[in-house]
Curated annotation (Swiss-Prot):
Family membership noted in the UniProt record: Belongs to the DNA polymerase type-C family. PolC subfamily.
GO CC entries: cytoplasm
Pfam families: DNA_pol3_a_NI, DNA_pol3_a_NII, DNA_pol3_alpha, DNA_pol3_finger, HHH_6, PHP, RNase_T, tRNA_anti-codon
Record has Nucleotidyltransferase as a keyword: yes
Gene: polC
Alphabetic keyword roster: Cytoplasm, DNA replication, DNA-directed DNA polymerase, Exonuclease, Hydrolase, Nuclease, Nucleotidyltransferase, Transferase
EC number from the UniProt entry: 2.7.7.7
Protein name: DNA polymerase III PolC-type
Lyase found in the keyword field: no
Catalytic activity: DNA(n) + a 2'-deoxyribonucleoside 5'-triphosphate = DNA(n+1) + diphosphate
Amino acid sequence: MTAKEEEKQERFQLLMTQIGLQDVTTYEEFTKDAKIEKLVADKKNKTWQFHLHVPQIFPAALFHMMDVGMKRAFSQIAETEMQIVPENQTIDETLIQDYWNLIVEPIGKQSPMIGKLLMEQKPTFKEPHFIEVAVHNDMEEATIQQRFQTKIIESYGKAGFPRLAMKMHLLDQSETEEYKAFALAKQEEDQKKAAEAVQVMQKRQAEGQSGGGGAAPLTGPFQIGYKIKDDEEVKRLGDIYDEERRITVQGLIFATEIRELRSGRSLLQFKITDYTSSMIIKMFSRDNEDAAMFQNLKKGMWVKVRGSVQNDTFVRDLIMMAQDVNEIAGVKRLDTAEEKRAELHLHSPMSQMDATSSVDSLFKQAADWGHKAIAITDHSVAQSFPEAYGAGQKYGLKVIFGIEANLIDDGVPIAYNDQHIALEDATYCVFDVETTGLSAVYDTIIELAGVKMKNGEIIDKFEAFIDPGHPLSATTINLTGITDDMVKGSDPIDVVLKRFKEWSGDDILVAHNASFDMGFINTAYEKVGLEKAENAVVDTLELARFLYPHFKNHRLNTLTKKFNIILEQHHRAVFDAEATAYLAWKLIKDAKEMHNIDFHDSLNDYMGEGDAYKRARPFHATIYAQTAVGLKNLFKLITMSNINYFYRVPRIPRSQLKKLREGLIIGTACSQGELFEAMMQKGMQAAEKVAEFYDFIEVQPKPVYAPLIERELVRDEKALEEILKNIVRVGEKTGKPVVATGNVHYKDPVDKIYRKILIHSQGGANPLNRAELPDVHFRTTDEMLKEFAFLGEEKAKEIVVTNANLVVDWMEDLKPIKDELYTPKIDGAEDEVRNMSYAMAHQLYGEKLPEIVEARLEKELKSIIGHGFAVIYLISHKLVKKSLVDGYLVGSRGSVGSSFVATMTEITEVNPLPPHYLCPNCKDSEFFDDGSVGSGFDLPDKDCPHCGTPYQKEGQDIPFETFLGFKGDKVPDIDLNFSGDYQPVAHAYTKEIFGEDYVFRAGTIGTVAEKTAFGYVRNYERDMNMTIRGAEIDRLVAGCTGVKRTTGQHPGGIIVIPDYMDVYDFTPVQFPADATDSEWKTTHFDFHSIHDNVLKLDILGHDDPTAIRMLQDLSGIDPKTIPTDDPDVMKLFGSTESLGVKPADIDSKTGTLGIPEFGTRFVRQMLEQTKPTTFSELVQISGLSHGTDVWLGNAEELIKNKTCELPDVIGCRDDIMVFLIYQGLESSLAFKIMESVRKGKGLTEEMEEAMMANKVPLWYIESCKKIKYMFPKAHAAAYVLMAVRIAYFKVHYPLYFYATYFTVRADDFDLTSMVNGKEAVKATMKEVNDKGMEASTKEKNLLTVLEIANEMLARGFHFQKVDLYKSSADEFIIDGDSLIPPFNAIPSLGTNVAKQIVAARENGEFLSKEDLQQRGKVSKTIIQYMDDQGCLEGLPDQNQLSLF
């Protein structure tokens, strides 16, 4: 070795010393001959690049240590980087993957989404030198290619790797509703299996058995590593702020995950919380025993963990690397009382944005504590009743079904103590009081002022301060402006009141919110020994609400400002009284003018009429169903409150509650109930009067009322106790049981934070944000007894235990949902369906039906009629028939095309019989029932041998069992795709068929999603100036998800109530999202809750029928006559030949852009690989593209490996049953195998054995095992039929196709690019593509439209500008070889304005741009856009008047 070479080696060793790695002996084989070849220093940019000559590529850990060490050592001098030059560039997949996180981690700072995508996977390595990663969609692929691919490859290059190439493959997942329903069912099934597995494991443990393989059964508490001593110091998670060497923590596990690493080891990752914070715990398995033990660590366990806390670069947060994990006993609240209470006031997550614990968790808690019953009382809704009933059955609890209603009085009086006094001639004593609080019982008047008014003029004044005998609170001083100095030494209350009573005499008393002021005056009169005022009274607040209901609010300062009345200092009695006087005179005159009210005793004549319910202030009451009649009445009240009396919240007028009181029990509810308010503000006598209306009285623990003290509505805890004691006395006096309830909003005290976050998210709109939230967790009997100890032990037990159970015993056991299906009845439906089916069959197949036809008809009709489904077929027939008569085709969804009766009754176009020829003339037929033909549409053209007429070709070979099950008893789910334009008509037609009172939109409940909850948590963190660890955020997010946020309606679901029942037998009714102007009412229950009880029609809106209708209108071609095997159309699915363009022209090797089901990049890739040429192969493609694990890693590999061809692979679920029957399997077993495979359950040993015995290929069996979800063939066939028809127009009538596509399917346009031609369009497409994942949704939608526009331009057609006199409002118009865009294609110009322009145009030419703006209702921005595009050439700016 030369001296120079030795020097280079010495420099390298010196470098290692400088960066602190001189003693790293582990990697000696990589570093001992390493040299610094050169150092490139860039003084200007302050960068140093070390070129290191090494024997072989460094391990990733060594490279990382050196990189970090160099950056740290030279940070004050320059930025550093390495360029490794290895002698041996040998690489493998392990090395590639070891470097992966180092290389892609920085990407997360530039694009968190792409960073996360890449960090969560490992690339695969393919020879010679390329790596492959997975992406979900085209935009992710484009973003990586354009922004990050080069950086990744260069980073590997700097580490010494040979030049790599990078490849991406697309993942796919069906987004259909059917898939979502399947996924939900699968999840529930998995959870059930998991629960069963736990039971089995526990049983084995009890019996001392051991299962083979999998998780090692626990024989005691879970433990990995050493035992952690009981007395070892435990650190709170909330006290950990930095890395720590070796500490112990403990907490509840709320998430677990086990990852299998490529090294063969397992990584256990779980999250724990001790409710001060949360943390991620990681642990690597040391051996197979550890890996097996990991399986036993479950969510819900409490554990103690010892390990080191460190910063994890992957999650960018502190985590703990665990050495020891011990299961410990959890923290549990126990109910140790011998006699248990029952909770009668409890909220579930259906109390909108207000309660967080699931029904299941609350009911389980009640059962664990030994309670025998529990009530549900959500705010105004019964939406948790179905779940509560199920939970009650599960845990053996009696469920009391109730609501916490918003009760209102029927109209609030404007006048009190009615007297026949002429209003214009009267003298008014207008007064105002300022007080120390809101309670006339516990607070005092500190200022009393009044003015006398006659004929609108003030004729006298009264003003006095009153000494309360104690210092004023800060709140009182701030609100009123009255200070201690102002009241100190003033006259006492009795003196002032006596003077005021004499001064006011018999005049009409007037106050703004008179119930408050009169309450204080009369209570004060009584206290000092004076009689209550008998004067006539006018309340200006209620009079203003009556006269001006449209005002946003009716506060005194708002009204005085509105009517230009001077209010010098609000909340000072003297100024308020004077302003109120002038306001009162204005209102009296308006009452005369607007309603001809002349006398005081006429002011209440309109009370309760019209919108009076909006003016009433709601108070809470709990309403329970005692009997079945009561349950139905409760449903009626909920409906009424949502439909007839909704204003901000659903309201129930007292009169309506009285009418429907049979079978109901009514409680007084919480602090917002009228009894508590009466006791707090008016005293014992008023409270006793209120109590008469109720069946029992509620009191709640003092902490539940804490906000009243904080807001100074109640003076202190002692005053609160006094109120509660008095309420108990009211119960004793009136004979009404007093029951202690918890107003429960969550299960445990630690759950309070979730509610805080939800309430905080609503800001000032929620009054609960005005004070600290109370503690409203589910309390044990012991906790409740302790809360009411101030009443004495005996009385506390009476209200907590005895009376609660007394009320429970009043209630009958009720079931809020039905057990059976109740379908509507149509007389003669069975005969009509049978007759229609046979009539159509004879019309098509002749008088003597082929045996295969008659057998199929009889088989289906037996099931359909026998199980009462004929009416469902008849209804669907009527809907489809009306649409067809009105000129719109209907596409079928789901498996309805599996039913030949559905075909014969014109519900679906799909014919499920085996492929066959059919003569339209002599009715001859020829069937192929041996599986040799996939679809009748694929049969070669042939003439009838009997009469020479060309045969029709039919039959898709789909078994009936896939629709109604093997026994034919499954409720038919007939989903129909109507034109989006026609869907409202189809919906309205159901009202004609059944009557408006029997059809409702299927209701849905929108809950807080994880993403939304994340936003709530982050905003809470920001507003509270907190820093919350990532794992804690995850816990808080989980605690906030699933809470009801709004309601809605299924896009196409119509619920039909049979006319021999009414809707209240099943559900209450409401408007979607509380939109009282909605055309449709919805079921109050989520439709899934009553899916098995009533008929649901799926009348969906779809673009395909709309497109077909427009194409028919343009061409005059009946779509039913379009051939399904046109050669040029079939070429479209494998090449661009039929379009007359090259693949490079349109950036696609197929011609299917814009063809439904076949236009996405994912499906186009499938077409390129499979090259389908027949209808049945297109059906295969449709099935493969919608399934899960049917194409990727399954059929794709089979075709690629030439194991089989496209027609042979499993595409749709029905293929399995048909193929297995053809192979010789018994039909019921074939059906079971199909059902098992389509649900992702795989095959049992017995199934496999039967398949192998019948010579089913091994590859077919293995393919079945991989499948997670499958598409029905009937659905695929219906979609493909529509697609082929549309493709026919694309090939043979291109401008009709493009005009239709842009009119029906496109929403976003770039007219400038489209009008300027192909290069402009391509340039805009490139701009969007260059943005990758950063492109907005609008830009992504535009890209799809531009792809079609580019194709149209490539075929030699072009776009014109929007034409002021030719353009349509909302349709593209064909003009020669071009399209004229409609007005609504202009950015920000809506369809209504577009129609206005056309309407104005029909009334005469536009004289100027000004004329267009005025008559067309067009904004200046739109005028400018149209002018810039040259659409307004020759049009002057303004109208010009010529004199000559």
